[in-house]
């Protein structure tokens, strides 16, 4: 069975995330543990941490199905030393927040070369950043999200993900989150070549590294390298893909997170997706 949820609001504090997830009928959720558009945030209070854990237990959310996301500002492959150090400090803070909350994963966008260094050099910096962070933390897996390849973002090709993983020293604490919109607009035809794409992922990256799914339709076409999510079945990926995905046991027992644009229909989307399983 799939564990389905969405990226829910933490307005009122991180402790509200499990409450908001329950409100849409979810059994998984994603959240930001701080303002995603600010470099620095005040530390999590003891009260917020305690309430978050209590609410997760009360509402029945297992930490294995909670997928926190780091700040959009962070670029672990930054070509400039100042930007790189700033990103590394912020990423460490995010990882430490996950530790405090008792969470098992931190999802992140790998980074961008900003047309100043090669793809390989950028990937090297990302892996080094992950290694530095894992050395200073325990119990939290760094989960690399594939990208659409917009601008100078890396992570749009499966080999990029494998390259980073190969250079991470603690293989037990690195994984991948596949975003269906990003996969499609990066040029992988999950609509017409479903089996081939996921077989390629298994061969290049390794299914054992797959930790989570971001389940989104796409407003932009195959190979466009533009990241614009759409509601399930309303975009160019189409409903048949999502029906097939929900019946594919390879994606059981991991958080499947909606980042679709209309949060007023998340409950309906989750209900529809669950109906495809039976």
UniProtKB/Swiss-Prot annotation:
Cofactor mode of binding and number, as noted: Binds 3 Zn(2+) ions.
GO terms, biological process: base-excision repair
UniProt-recorded Gene Ontology molecular function terms: deoxyribonuclease IV (phage-T4-induced) activity; DNA binding; DNA-(apurinic or apyrimidinic site) endonuclease activity; phosphoric diester hydrolase activity; zinc ion binding
Function: Endonuclease IV plays a role in DNA repair. It cleaves phosphodiester bonds at apurinic or apyrimidinic (AP) sites, generating a 3'-hydroxyl group and a 5'-terminal sugar phosphate.
Binding residue positions for Zn(2+) 1: 69, 109, 145
Chain coiled-coil ranges: none
Catalytic activity reported: Endonucleolytic cleavage to 5'-phosphooligonucleotide end-products
Highest taxon listed in the record's lineage: Bacteria
Residues that coordinate or bind Zn(2+) 3: 182, 227, 229
Family annotation (PROSITE patterns): AP_NUCLEASE_F2_1, AP_NUCLEASE_F2_2, AP_NUCLEASE_F2_3, AP_NUCLEASE_F2_4
Binding locations of Zn(2+) 2: 145, 179, 214, 259
Stored InterPro entries: AP_endonuc_2, AP_endonuc_F2_Zn_BS, Xyl_isomerase-like_sf, Xyl_isomerase-like_TIM-brl
UniProt keyword Hydrolase present: yes
Protein family according to the UniProt entry: Belongs to the AP endonuclease 2 family.
S-S bridge residues: none
Record keywords: DNA damage, DNA repair, Endonuclease, Hydrolase, Metal-binding, Nuclease, Zinc
Record-linked NCBIfam families: nfo, PRK01060.1-4
Name of the molecule in the record: Probable endonuclease 4
PANTHER family (alphabetical): APURINIC-APYRIMIDINIC ENDONUCLEASE (PTHR21445:SF0), ENDONUCLEASE IV ENDODEOXYRIBONUCLEASE IV (PTHR21445)
Organism lineage string: Bacteria, Pseudomonadati, Bacteroidota, Bacteroidia, Bacteroidales
């Amino acid at each position: 069975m799939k564990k389905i949820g969405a990226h829910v609001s933490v307005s009122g504090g991180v402790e509200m995330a499990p409450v908001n997830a329950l409100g849409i009928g979810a059994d998984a959720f994603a959240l930001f543990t701080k303002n995603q558009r600010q470099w620095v945030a005040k530390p999590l209070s003891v009260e917020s941490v305690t309430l978050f854990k209590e609410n997760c237990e009360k509402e029945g959310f297992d930490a294995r199905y909670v997928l926190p996301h780091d700040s959009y500002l962070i670029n672990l492959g930054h070509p400039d030393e100042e930007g790189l150090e700033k990103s590394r400090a912020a990423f460490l803070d995010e990882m430490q927040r996950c530790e405090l909350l008792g969470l098992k994963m931190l999802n992140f966008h790998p980074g961008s070369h900003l047309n100043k260094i090669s793809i390989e050099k950028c990937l090297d910096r990302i892996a080094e950043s992950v290694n530095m962070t894992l050395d200073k933390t325990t119990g939290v897996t760094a989960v690399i999200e594939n990208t659409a390849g917009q601008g100078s973002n890396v992570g749009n090709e499966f080999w990029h993900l494998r390259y980073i993983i190969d250079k991470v020293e603690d293989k037990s604490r690195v994984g991948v989150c596949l975003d269906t919109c990003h996969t499609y607009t990066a040029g992988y035809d999950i609509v017409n070549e479903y089996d081939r794409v996921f077989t390629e992922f298994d061969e290049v990256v390794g299914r054992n590294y797959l930790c989570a799914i971001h389940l989104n339709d796409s407003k932009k076409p195959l190979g466009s390298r533009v990241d614009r999510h759409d509601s399930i079945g309303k975009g160019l990926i189409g409903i048949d893909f999502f029906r097939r995905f929900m019946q594919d046991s390879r994606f059981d027992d991991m958080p499947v997170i909606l980042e679709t644009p209309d949060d007023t229909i998340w409950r309906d989307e989750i209900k529809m997706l669950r109906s495809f399983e039976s």
